[in-house]
Structures are given as C-alpha cells and as structure tokens.
Amino acid sequence: MAGHSKWANIKHRKAAQDAKRGKMFTKMIREITTAARLGGPDGGSNPRLRAAVAAALSINMTRDTVDRAIKRGAGGDDGVELETLVYEGYGPSGTAVMVECMTDNRNRTVAGVRHAFSKSGGALGTDGSVAYLFTKKGILSFTSADEDALMEAALEAGADDVETNDDGSIDVYTSPNDFGTVLDALEAAGFKPDNANVSMIPSTEVDLNADDAPKLLRLIDMLEDLDDVQEVYHNGTISDEVAATLE
C-alpha cells in the first residue's frame, strides 16, 4: 500500500506480483476483521476500520469482500483471538525498521521476525529503540490532480499538510483520527486517491549505497513474506543511481 512519496520507491517492491497480491488481500482482510471486532462496523466512528477499508479498496479489493470481512469481525464468531504487536529493529546502514504484526502466537511471530533481521544483516531492537523516528499519519496519494484545487479542498477538510513530489504526484497528510473525514470530503469534491492508508512516516532518512540497498530489500521481502506481518515501515531511501544498479 505504498504511496508516491520519496521513500516509497523501495517499499513493497513485489506488490504487483500475483502471489504477493494474494497475500496482501489476506492481510488486509485480517486487518478489516480485527478493526471491526475491536471498534465496531461503522467506519464513521472507527478510524482504524475506515483506514483499512480505504486501503483495501485502493488495491482493488471488491466491496463485497470488504463487507464480508466487516460482518465477520463485527460478529466475532471465528474463534480466533489476534493481537497487534509492533517490533522495532535496525537494518543495514542503521536504517530504522518497524514491523507491525497481527498474531495468535507471539513466540512464532517474534522468531520469524528475528530470523529475517539476522539473515539480512540487521538486528531486532527493544521497544522504543526506533519508534521515536516515526509519526503516525494518514496519507492520501494522487497521481495527478489540480494542485491548487486539491490543496484548498484538503486543508478545508482538515488535512495537516499537502506535498507535491518531483514526479508531479501529490500527497495529502492527515492525523489518524481525521483520515476518514478528509477522505470523504475529497471524494465528495471529486478527488479520488490512488492510494489511501494510515502509515508511519519517518522524520529522518538514510541513503543506502549499492552494497546495503539489496540487503534492506531482502529484509523487507523476508518480513513481508511472514504471514503474521501486516506492515513494514522504514526510513531507508535508494537513489535513482543506486536503483539502476539493482535492476
């Protein structure tokens, strides 16, 4: 569910592959179900559910599938108790990495996460070791839109900031609680985001060289391949020059 921002060039690189897409759908359904179970089926009063639904629709999940996941979560009848865990660690070049998991078995999950870090030249950290480098925000990404009109509509709806990227795409940032309100207002104004999600935004970035870039990509891929992992956030960036050497 990466957006168009400058660090998104190395997030979820395999998202276009069919197998990866299937896993994304499975994880998104799990998030929707859990959000509905914990906060109720009304997205208007449940920001976590609203964000999950928006993210699911942005990757072309059908509304019917979304509604079934909400109904299952609200009913709470699947007998599986899942908890959300966040692990923090360090990747190559000291990159900060946060791993959001949803699991019914902590021991299995932490073992898989630790293995991914150790196999990729990283290390699992302690609680709070890198979390301070990230801020939780809603992101609405638009490939193309009238910048002035979008900015006016977004700020009027309560967005925190609007940024135009080098490629012409536009990112609208919100607080997590205002995400649904801003999304609804922009869609009502005719602006449909290409991607919409609540993410962890790094306050600082680490530029990776040609040696460390593939190591971070390996770490991300290994983590995302774990069934219990929902999201991977990091502050690594790869320049166009270095990216060209990885093709």
Swiss-Prot record:
One GO-annotated biological process of the protein: regulation of DNA-templated transcription
Entry keyword Transcription regulation: yes
UniProt cross-references to Pfam families, sorted A to Z: TACO1_YebC_N, Transcrip_reg
Region (Disordered): 1-21
Subcellular location: Cytoplasm
GO cellular component annotations of the record: cytosol
SUPFAM superfamilies (UniProt xref): YebC-like (SSF75625)
GO MF term (any one): DNA binding
Keywords in alphabetical order: Cytoplasm, DNA-binding, Transcription, Transcription regulation
InterPro entries linked to this entry: Integrase-like_N (IPR017856), TACO1_YebC-like_2nd/3rd_dom (IPR048300), TACO1_YebC_N (IPR049083), Transcrip_reg_TACO1-like (IPR002876), Transcrip_reg_TACO1-like_dom3 (IPR026564), YebC-like (IPR029072)
Family per record: Belongs to the TACO1 family.
Protein name (database record): Probable transcriptional regulatory protein Tola_2714
